[in-house]
Amino acid sequence: MRLPYYFLSLLFPTILMGQAYIHPENNEAFLQNEVAEIHITVSQNHLNTLLGDSLYSNYHFPGVFRYESSSFSDTLENIGFRVRGNTSRNAQKKGFKISFNENVVGQKFKGIEKMNLVGQHNDPSLLRYWTSLYLLKKHELIASRMSFVKLYINSEYRGVYLNVEHIDDEFLQKRFINDDNGNLYKASWGADLNYWGANAASYKSVYELKTNKDSNDYSAFILFLDSLNNLSDGDFPCYMERNFEVNHYLKTLATEIIIGHWDGHAYNKNNFYLYRQPSNGKFIFIEYDLDNSFGIDWFGIDWANRDLNDWHETNRPLVERLLDVPYYKDVFNAHLDTMLSDLDSSSWYSVLAAKQNLIKSAVLSDTYYRKDYGFQYSDFLVGLDDNYGAHVKNGLAEYLDERITSGLGQIDLIGDLEPACDELTHEPARQIVKIVDFIGRETLFRTDIPLIIMYDDGTAEKVMVWGN
């Protein structure tokens, strides 16, 4: 079968035509080779209220922020400080949010307006969230920057925290250059992406508009949900290609499933953003809050062996309708195959071991690490390889090893290379000769998976090289 190259360009835009976003470099706010210190000073009365009557409030209490590293220090006054999270607000090791511009308009710390400090009280390894973001970035997907820090509040050491970049207008400006003024919707629990009617009020408690709040416009979002749920099977693929970053999402979904992030959209209808890019009107999917992953479990489900192609919960129209299209199911499985194969042959364990070594001295003196589940320092040291029991069904590396082995046996490539949308047209690309795998990565011959040979006349041919 010979296919016009422009179909590949349309279906694999982030690979063959350049992705529409960038990942900014780390700076002093996100140090990778040391554990910086954050010191928060607030009045004791305010701290008592913050941790007491105001625990479930998002009210910011005024304070002073000081940041200390081996080569850099800075102090910002009149910042806002509060508890963050959902169920984790009940934890002994709570998460916190710092808002640098809450009381001083335009105040930033190293280009960021807000800082999320995640306690990771469920995770004895303290590495699950970090590893999730690391893999999103490795897979060239949109991800927050992150770093480990030591947190002090009124001189009391509160433990090791993961500093996670906040998703807001500053986040968009650093990733969508000259295309950052669109609507950003934050989806919390209940976000199944079903159509709930034309009234915007029906959506606002679950899908919070985080940018352009004055216009308060949900019209394009509601139209997208209406179309996602109600278009015919024949019209669905072309609509999605015009209005949603399909390949980016299929790649994100593959990552979400591989890491066992059940607290995201596909299983728990939770924890994601949708951003509508002004330049093309397309929505793009962004993950956040990825700490419940890599074998953390409250449902009695074996996430390390769960079927990759039947992993999601029911009543998820975005996942179900996309994977009902044979072409998209193949693209999804090709992403899974590539990611699992890369993990199988990479040195990811040494990356995790190095990060564990970086933070271990800070964990040793973290008394809050022990307060929620009785974790001991010894549990941290074996957190990569051994399960803790209870809700921690796998060590992080133990989970990955098991997921790679089981996952490679669950790949389901149909081999259907017909484009999902055949009415889009595009001029043929410039002359090119190369071999790519099914998701557009230049490669050598591999056995038992589809490969695409691209010719200098703008056509392409699918081949299979069978193993023994």
List the predicted regions and their residue ranges.
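C-terminal tail/sorting-segment detector
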Residues: P450-N468
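Internal "kinase-insert"/substrate-recognition segments embedded within catalytic cores
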Residues: K97-V105, G119-Q120, H139-S144, E156-I259, ...
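Middle-to-C-terminal accessory/interaction subdomains
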Residues: A20, N27-E28, V35, H46, ...
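Bacterial Sec-dependent N-terminal signal peptides
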Residues: M1-Y21, C421
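A conserved helix-loop-beta module that forms one wall/lid of the active-site cleft
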Residues: Q120-N154
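Conserved NTP-binding catalytic cores of kinases and kinase-like/nucleotidyltransferase enzymes
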Residues: Q19-S125, T131
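A general beta-strand register signal
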Residues: R66-E68, Y152, D437, M454
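Residue-level detector of functionally pivotal "anchor" positions at catalytic/ligand-binding pockets or at interdomain
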Residues: Q410-T443, N468
